[in-house]
Amino acid sequence: VQRKVPQLSLGQVWNGPELPPAAKDWAEDPSVSALVEEVAARRLQIADAQKKISDFAASLPAEQLAPKMTMLVQGMFDHMDAERSHVISGISRYAHKQLEMAAALRKQASDVDQLRAKPDADQDEVERRTDQLNFATRIFNERVQSLTYVCDVPTIIEQRLYQLSKTVSETLAAKK
């Protein structure tokens, strides 16, 4: 079980120097903006993302290294924190829907029990409603399993952001 932290702070993932105000303009730099999009994508293996960051740093003239790399950190943070917040919002909606489904299942089960208790109950109707209840319960249980997996996604995004920020920090330290 993880505690809900709606937004990250830069200090949680960046242990380098304070980012200059100009780093906030990362979206206006096409090369930084494109790299942020690439490395933030979870489908790209972390090692490949780290290599892209290293290659980017190696391609920069010395005087552009620090400004561009701090823009990259700010961009990764802004992009991945927004993605993480979006996922958390989706998890919240999903969990709320699960609560509604659970209440509906309890009502459906109670109705089936009442129908079974009637001595003159139509057995075909009892069987049909029992099948519906079993199917709805199976769907509910599969959604519970999915919710468990989906709840890991914000942590996966955080860990990726930390690893990528650490790569930038190490790259900057190596160039000094």
Identify the residue ranges that each predicted region occupies.
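Heptad-repeat alpha-helical rod positions in long coiled-coil/spectrin-like domains
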Residues: 85, 89-92, 96, 103, ...
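Short E/K-rich amphipathic alpha-helical oligomerization segments
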Residues: 107-135
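A composition-driven signal for long, intrinsically disordered, charge-rich low-complexity tracts
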Residues: 9-11, 15-16, 20, 88, ...
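Non-transmembrane amphipathic alpha-helical segments
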Residues: 80, 87, 94, 98-116
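Generic alpha-helical secondary structure signal
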Residues: 30, 47, 51, 67, ...
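Alpha-helical oligomerization segments
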Residues: 124-176
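N-terminal Sec/ER secretory leader and immediately downstream segment
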Residues: 1-66
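Short, charge-rich amphipathic alpha-helices with coiled-coil/heptad character
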Residues: 58-89
